[in-house]
Amino acid sequence: MTEVKSYKPGTFCWADLATPNPTAAKRFYSELFGWKTQDNPLPGGGAYTLARINGGDIAGLMGMTEKGIPSHWNSYVAVANVDEATKKATSLGGKVLAPPMDVMDLGRMAVIQDPAGAELSLWQGKKQIGAGRVGEHGALVWNELQTRNVDACGAFYTKLFGWKTEAQKGVFVETYTLFNDGAEPRAGMMPISKQTPANVPSHWTVYFAVNDCDAIAKKVASLGGKAVMPPTDIPDVGRFSMFFDPEGAFFAVLQPNQR
């Protein structure tokens, strides 16, 4: 269990869910992880929901009105200056999907797309640094890029965030790439399997920590979700599983090995 007061640039700091049915999403994730939720009205209408555990912000949920866009989890990386990071992303071959903008007095953000098409949000925190708790049951614990171009994305992210790469033996792929900042691991990367349908884009996956992966898998099914990967051991790491929630948003859970 970890309380967070600040984030170093280049660290994943937040995740939020965009869904056409926020009421159902709140019910699903609250029952699954034990989240408490609070709706915060937005200036243009609607609400942004904060999910909390033990008094700390964990993640966000928001309604989505655009047609044809499936429910999805967005990943956020902390940066010192959103405007500069966005310019750097474009110079490295990325695209800007949403230019830098202020989010009230909470912070400043932008949404970019890497050279292989995976979307990622950049966050310059002000009043809101990001998640207040990480690594405990129901909170963020890992982020993983599944991509169709490992080489291009490895070069892109190392130059954008100052990450380093470390090749490791994979469980389902020959090589799993670990991104780190020279001291701490920051994220993982693996190629999308050849069996994956061509219409599945490169994407960042959000992992939530859980105390019991198998129990969570059963609970997901009872709440209307669908397993994509059953509970599976990762040597020296823990036990994980992947799911679609009832609205079709993809996410994963990890039961870390006891240290």
Per-segment meaning from a language model:
Residues 1-26, 72-75, 123-155, 163-166, ...:
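N-terminal beta-strand motif that seeds the catalytic metal site of vicinal oxygen chelate
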Residues 34, 56, 79-80, 96, ...:
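Short, low-complexity, polar/charged sequence segments that are solvent-exposed and flexible
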Residues 1-8, 11-20, 49-52, 64-88, 90-141, 166-184, ...:
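Vicinal oxygen chelate
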Residues 7-9, 13-56, 91, 99-111, ...:
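Core segments of cupin and vicinal oxygen chelate
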Residues 57-63:
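Active-site-flanking structural segment that lines cofactor/substrate pockets
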